[in-house]
């Protein structure tokens, strides 16, 4: 276990920010004020487009946690206990998962300080990120493993608690690829021959691309998103774009939920809009599956469900999708009343996606 002298400046800064936050609560008490904590309202109606950064961020509407009410007082109490835990964790240079924090709270001496659900503890960590301006990774808090992986011509060095490791994301890994760590800022890019990043929603399609040698033939960094991408995955994608100047493309199923996967990569998510500048890659381009692909290739489809239709209509009102391209595609999908999976391309043969669909789309987009 590391001592105080071993902790990094980032760790010290994170701890100081937490202590300052707790001190602010104390000062409010000392001044005879009711303690409060103000955070941006995390709803779709409170995100605005940042013209400078080209990402969606929280607007001016705020919500206030106030000890004037029982529920507000309990939230602030839980915040204080959590700050104490995080401060001690940083002092000892340890880490924990979001799940562990939820269970660990059961050992706290006040029942009112304990979390009732994991969503409650997760949301509090997000609140603390916002008010302290420190990312949860710098609190040494991590989610459960996302399982997201990278395959392609990239040599990197990863810092681990067992020392540094140099890994080539083709030569030194099996077909499963290199697993993205919880904090990708511990990675240093050493060398690469990649021409672009291809983010893939499903594991089945990712495996098809690797088996067909797409990463090798086209010098692609294939990033498996694993559904809605974790923060670590989005951070790595942004770093690959910003630091290696690689174009980023996103390849998903053709349904409204998958379009939101693209949205989280490109524009940022509503839940983490306070980190959009850190996580979002606004230059990312959507490959498909587009509704027009469903029509053009006569792909096997399923009918849209009521929830699909509601989601598409909601996206038409979502500022992240208010572009000519997305409005045209969503209107088309509502008109044809169909959706399709990535693997529906296999109806034209197992090699169609790597020999025809992706090369043609990437050429149209100016990537190849």
Curated annotation (Swiss-Prot):
<keyword id="KW-0479">Metal-binding</keyword>
<dbReference type="InterPro" id="IPR002815">
    <property type="entry name" value="Spo11/TopoVI_A"/>
</dbReference>
<protein>
    <recommendedName>
        <fullName>Type 2 DNA topoisomerase 6 subunit A</fullName>
        <ecNumber>5.6.2.2</ecNumber>
    </recommendedName>
</protein>
<dbReference type="GO" id="GO:0003918">
    <property type="term" value="F:DNA topoisomerase type II (double strand cut, ATP-hydrolyzing) activity"/>
</dbReference>
<dbReference type="GO" id="GO:0003677">
    <property type="term" value="F:DNA binding"/>
</dbReference>
<dbReference type="InterPro" id="IPR034136">
    <property type="entry name" value="TOPRIM_Topo6A/Spo11"/>
</dbReference>
<dbReference type="InterPro" id="IPR049333">
    <property type="entry name" value="Topo_VI_alpha"/>
</dbReference>
<comment type="similarity">
    <text>Belongs to the TOP6A family.</text>
</comment>
<feature type="binding site">
    <location>
        <position position="201"/>
    </location>
    <ligand>
        <name>Mg(2+)</name>
    </ligand>
</feature>
<dbReference type="GO" id="GO:0005694">
    <property type="term" value="C:chromosome"/>
</dbReference>
<dbReference type="Pfam" id="PF21180">
    <property type="entry name" value="TOP6A-Spo11_Toprim"/>
</dbReference>
<keyword id="KW-0799">Topoisomerase</keyword>
<dbReference type="InterPro" id="IPR013049">
    <property type="entry name" value="Spo11/TopoVI_A_N"/>
</dbReference>
<keyword id="KW-0238">DNA-binding</keyword>
<dbReference type="InterPro" id="IPR036388">
    <property type="entry name" value="WH-like_DNA-bd_sf"/>
</dbReference>
<feature type="active site" description="O-(5'-phospho-DNA)-tyrosine intermediate">
    <location>
        <position position="103"/>
    </location>
</feature>
<keyword id="KW-0067">ATP-binding</keyword>
<dbReference type="GO" id="GO:0000287">
    <property type="term" value="F:magnesium ion binding"/>
</dbReference>
<dbReference type="Pfam" id="PF20768">
    <property type="entry name" value="Topo_VI_alpha"/>
</dbReference>
<dbReference type="GO" id="GO:0005524">
    <property type="term" value="F:ATP binding"/>
</dbReference>
<comment type="function">
    <text>Relaxes both positive and negative superturns and exhibits a strong decatenase activity.</text>
</comment>
<dbReference type="InterPro" id="IPR004085">
    <property type="entry name" value="TopoVI_A"/>
</dbReference>
<dbReference type="Pfam" id="PF04406">
    <property type="entry name" value="TP6A_N"/>
</dbReference>
<feature type="domain" description="Topo IIA-type catalytic">
    <location>
        <begin position="9"/>
        <end position="148"/>
    </location>
</feature>
<dbReference type="InterPro" id="IPR036078">
    <property type="entry name" value="Spo11/TopoVI_A_sf"/>
</dbReference>
<keyword id="KW-0413">Isomerase</keyword>
<feature type="binding site">
    <location>
        <position position="253"/>
    </location>
    <ligand>
        <name>Mg(2+)</name>
    </ligand>
</feature>
<keyword id="KW-0547">Nucleotide-binding</keyword>
<dbReference type="GO" id="GO:0006265">
    <property type="term" value="P:DNA topological change"/>
</dbReference>
<comment type="subunit">
    <text>Homodimer. Heterotetramer of two Top6A and two Top6B chains.</text>
</comment>
<keyword id="KW-0460">Magnesium</keyword>
């Amino acid at each position: 276990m590391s001592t105080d002298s071993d902790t990094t400046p980032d760790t010290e800064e994170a701890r100081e920010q937490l202590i300052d936050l707790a001190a602010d609560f104390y000062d409010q008490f000392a001044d005879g004020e009711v303690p409060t904590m103000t955070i941006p309202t995390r709803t779709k109606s409170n995100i605005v487009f940042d013209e400078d950064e080209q990402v969606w961020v929280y607007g001016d509407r705020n919500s206030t946690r106030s000890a004037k009410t029982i529920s507000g007082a309990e939230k602030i109490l839980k915040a204080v206990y959590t700050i104490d835990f995080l401060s001690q964790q940083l002092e000892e240079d340890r880490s924990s998962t979001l799940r562990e924090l939820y269970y660990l709270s059961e050992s706290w001496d006040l029942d009112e300080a304990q979390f009732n659900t994991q969503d409650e503890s997760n949301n509090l960590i997000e609140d603390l990120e916002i008010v302290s301006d420190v990312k949860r990774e710098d609190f040494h808090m991590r989610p459960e493993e996302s399982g997201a992986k990278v395959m392609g011509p990239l040599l990197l060095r990863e810092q681990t608690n067992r020392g540094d490791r140099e890994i080539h994301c083709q030569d030194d890994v099996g077909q499963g690829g290199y697993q993205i760590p919880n904090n990708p800022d511990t990675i240093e890019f050493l060398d690469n021959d990649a021409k672009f990043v291809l983010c893939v929603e499903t594991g089945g399609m990712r495996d098809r691309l690797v088996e067909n040698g797409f990463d090798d033939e086209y010098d692609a960094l294939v990033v498996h998103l694993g559904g809605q991408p974790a923060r670590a995955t989005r951070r790595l994608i942004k770093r690959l774009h910003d630091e290696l100047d690689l174009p980023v493309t996103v390849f998903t199923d053709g349904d409204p939920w998958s379009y939101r996967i693209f949205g989280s990569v490109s524009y940022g998510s509503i839940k983490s809009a306070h980190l959009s500048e850190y996580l979002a890659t606004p230059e990312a381009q959507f490959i498909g599956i587009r509704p027009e692909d469903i029509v053009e290739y006569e792909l096997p489809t399923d009918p849209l469900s009521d929830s699909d239709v509601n989601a598409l209509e909601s996206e038409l009102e979502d500022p992240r999708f208010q572009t000519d391209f997305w409005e045209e595609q969503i209107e088309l999908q509502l008109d044809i009343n169909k959706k399709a999976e990535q693997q529906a391309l296999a109806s034209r043969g197992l090699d169609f996606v790597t020999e025809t669909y992706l090369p043609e789309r990437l050429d149209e987009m100016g990537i190849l």
